[in-house]
Amino acid sequence: MKRRDFLLSLAAAACLPGCHSPSKPGLPPGNLLGAGLERGHRLRGRDFPAPSETRQVGVAIVGGGIAGLSSAWKLNKSGFGDFRLFELEDETGGNARAGHNAVSAYPWGAHYLPLPGPEARDVRELLADLGVLRGDPHAEAPVYDERFLCFAPQERLYRHGIWQEGLLPQIGATRRDQEQYRRFFDLLERYRQQRSATGERAFAIPAVLSSRDPELLALDTLSMRAFMLQHGLDSEPLHWYVNYGCRDDYGSHHGEVSAWAGLHYFLSRDGFAANGDGEQVLTWPEGNAWLAQQMRQRFDERVETAALVHRIAEYPRHVELDVYLARENRTVRWRANRVIFAAPVFVLPHVVADLDSSLRDAASAVQYAPWLVANLTLGEALQHGNGAA
């Protein structure tokens, strides 16, 4: 299903509460929130006013999601203040924005952060700067502010009328299934312990710091499903579990996700807290919008929202950016020494003049999967039923 059709079907369902089976309750009242499409779609028509003035800046950052905000944070933290961040929407945050109601703040999208491992040095330094991480950010197991560590039960699976802890199916699993579970996790552990000749872990975050051993890179040539079958793992509930993980992280079936990517999902999140465990995550009522807001506060005066970058042109000594200011209905031309492009990749061919054909083809080939976060306000406590509370 195309993203547009998916969103329209949700909107239609929300608008037709009376059109349902008499035996089933209708959808509760609510809103479908997301990116404002109209402003971005102006890139197709190119009907922007000519620039009314020209300004100078050292670094221009295109996009105010977590990537753009963290780039700005890094520059600012390093003592470099000659930058400007441009965000299409009325608020920064991108997929890490949030809303509020009478009960609580709630995330629109990204809603937790796995504990960063030792390779994620910049992430740890960011968390230390924001007061989330206490003490040495490069300790093997740093101390985190316990207000932000998720101690509550994180995942539940409803199977055969019973709630169980975790997502790996246990209720109804046969002895053969359990044996294959053990073999699968033993296999993961062998990869977890593997190191390259120069000491890199097999799978790390950032991914660029993962081992480049040919044996591991060859895993990118077969699917995660094929990899499992190659190792004699054909348990149906085990395949369901792995497929769930691939759909969650990549938006695709484990028969389409490469074995390298599938293993990276299971093995790259290895951060620990001195005052917690490796299964915990960092989270806030508003999700990762908390991180976005905390970063922006440090350089708010250098952020422009409702600012659509519709042209980027590179010259020998500078880069030109034409920025449409929606609130003022005018275009400002910026001349920058450097540009950090932190907007979605598919936008590149629409804004960069004379984009290299290989980059254009690569950007056009990127596919995105729809991702919906549902926030529910409950009128009364849930009835847990049988199984794990």
Go through the PLM ranges and name each one.
Residues 68:
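N-terminal Rossmann-fold NAD(P) dinucleotide-binding loop
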Residues 63-65:
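Glycine-rich Rossmann-fold phosphate-binding loop(s) that bind the pyrophosphate
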Residues 103-191:
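Dinucleotide-binding Rossmann-like beta1-alpha1 core, especially the glycine-rich loop
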Residues 305-389:
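Mid-domain catalytic core of redox enzymes
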Residues 59-61, 83:
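Conserved hydrophobic helix-helix packing surfaces used for dimerization/oligomerization
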Residues 2-58, 77:
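Extreme N-terminal leader/targeting segments of oxidoreductases
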Residues 76-99:
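Glycine-rich FAD pyrophosphate-binding loop
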Residues 193-318, 335:
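Active-site/ligand-binding neighborhood in enzyme catalytic cores
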